[in-house]
Amino acid sequence: MLLERIYNHVVREKQWNIGFPDKSLEELVHGASFSVRMLRHSYTDRWFADPFVLEVTDDEILLLAEDYDIHLRRGRISLLTVERNTLELKKLTPVLDVPRHLSFPCIVRRNDKVFIMPENLFGEGLTLYEFDQKTCSCRKEKVVSTQPLADAVLTDVFGKEEMLLGTYLPYDNPVLHTFVYNAQREEVRQESYVFADKTARNAGAFFECDGKLYRPAQDGKLYYGQGIVIQQVTRDETGRLAFHEVCRLSSPTTGQPSRMHTLNSYKGVTVVDMAACQHPHIARVAVQLKKHFCVIKR
């Protein structure tokens, strides 16, 4: 137990920030090398992670993201208005704050409305909120699930049915659970998928590229935020999904933060989040011990 606490402290204690890859989503899927321009901001009491792109204009990028207060040790969901040319944070607007930690604000678009479904592991579960961009406010729509799912995604990419996908803690849980809902929003089917390489946890929303469907997944084999795995997703006639790895994304250079666990894209803008360990040299030794000698086990 003591070794586990020490490992978590040196490997997982870090501050996240949002980044913008210099390559298109299509290029990333095809394995192109890339660098990342980081969000510029002056906040020292908080960090930002789990970005989803809300809107893109000629001048601005609007993001919904986890806004983590270092002193409260709790996240809320905020709207980040980013200057597109400089990637400077122009405005930070809280949009959803509850007594429990919130993160991973999955965006769901239905007709002309925008909804968000943030992770809320220790609250009432996964709640869908209608987001009003004019007032930057959220109205509770419904509780989608009371299951304590991490980094859950709600999607209708498979047609009339909606699908909820998520994992249970710990972060390296190898099982992805899916819940399928009919047009009346009634649950009609549950399934599970085991990932031996511990890439079950979502890293963002499904996306299409070159006519194919992909899922960004988290690589959690050795530690939280190890990298992102892009998986092509297919579906058979019974509704069963299949996941095929096509590429892996990790910190592009040694001069940039070494962790990455979210990727999303909308209207040609792709975002990730990245972080560096507070104790990088010790963390490197700890990871090698876990990898080669199995001294530290989760």
State where each predicted segment sits.
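Carbohydrate-active catalytic/glycan-binding domains of CAZyme proteins
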Residues: 1-298
